[in-house]
Amino acid sequence: MEFWGLEVKPGSTVKCEPGHGFILHVSQAALGESKKSDSALMYVKVDDKKLAIGTLSIDKYPQIQFDLVFNKEFELSHTSKTTSVFFSGYKVEQPIEGDEMDLDSEDEEEELNIPVIKENGKADGKEEQKNQEKAVAATASKSSLGLEKKSKDDSDDSDEDESDDSDEDDSDDSDEGEGLSPDEGDDDSSDEDDTSDDDEEETPTPKKPEAGKKRGAENALKTPLSDKKAKVATPPAQKTGGKKGATHVATPHPAKGKTPANNDKLTEKSPKSGGSVPCKSCSKTFNSEMALQAHSKAKHGAK
């Protein structure tokens, strides 16, 4: 900052120049010594424009304070014919916007670009670049390992969920297979009733042993329509004539269209004689053990 001041004599005009790179602040104006009461109206002219900035009076306002800022040439004048007017202020350097921006950018570049200096005092830019590349590669490898591990964990979880779902489906299917629908039960009971009725009608006139074989084949062919009913085994036959009947008959899948493998064995073990077999629960008699079993299961719920 630099002090500034000048005198404007009566009837004269003074040009003022702030100077290159400076700003001029006019902060005060005062009247000089005078023996008569006098007043002065002050003017400033900038770019062909003349403006009044104040009035000085020895009796009332011998001085005035203000703050006028000029960055280019201007002119000062007043109307007093007997007394001079003194102006005072100060000058400061005007900052350049481009220089400030350049200084800031240079400081930032110096902070960012700090080279590695060896013992011999020379900067080693290649070594710094290699270190940066190594750091970037290490970070990338860690991130890729983390992603692979996460994807592996997700796949394991999905496999476990699928296995659990399949186990639940299998258990549901097995539970459904164990129970029989009412329609299937009705079909079986109706078939057994028909068989028992046929046996009752044929009881008075027993025929050749071949009739028992045919009935055994018919009963063997009446297998359940669902593959789930194949799990139910036929009950063991009662002892007739000191011999045991077939203990278990497994029925094949109906889709294959084959008759049971042990069909011949069942027919062979059926009674060959035309004698009657009485029911222990009621007074009815049957001409074969198979007919008695079908009757007992249908009428008396034998297991």
Curated annotation (Swiss-Prot):
Keyword Metal-binding (UniProt): yes
ATP-binding listed as a keyword: no
GO MF term set: hydrolase activity; zinc ion binding
UniProt keyword terms in alphabetical order: Chromatin regulator, Hydrolase, Metal-binding, Nucleus, Phosphoprotein, Repressor, Transcription, Transcription regulation, Zinc, Zinc-finger
Organism in which the protein naturally occurs: Zea mays
GO annotation, cellular component aspect: nucleolus
Residue ranges of the region described as Disordered: 100-282
Cellular compartments annotated: Nucleus, Nucleolus
A Pfam entry, by short name: NPL
Feature: compositional bias, Basic and acidic residues: 119-133, 204-217
Protein name: Histone deacetylase HDT2
Subunit structure: Multimer. Possibly forms a homotrimer with HDT1 and/or HDT3.
Ranges of compositional bias, category Acidic residues: 100-112, 154-203
Xref: InterPro entries: NPL (IPR041232), Znf_C2H2_type (IPR013087)
Top-rank taxon, per record: Eukaryota
Zinc finger intervals, C2H2-type: 277-300
A GO BP annotation: chromatin organization
Recorded coiled-coil stretches: none
Function: Mediates the deacetylation of lysine residues on the N-terminal part of the core histones (H2A, H2B, H3 and H4). Histone deacetylation gives a tag for epigenetic repression and plays an important role in transcriptional regulation, cell cycle progression and developmental events.
Family the entry assigns: Belongs to the histone deacetylase HD2 family.
Gene3D superfamilies linked to this entry: Nucleoplasmin core domain (2.60.120.340)
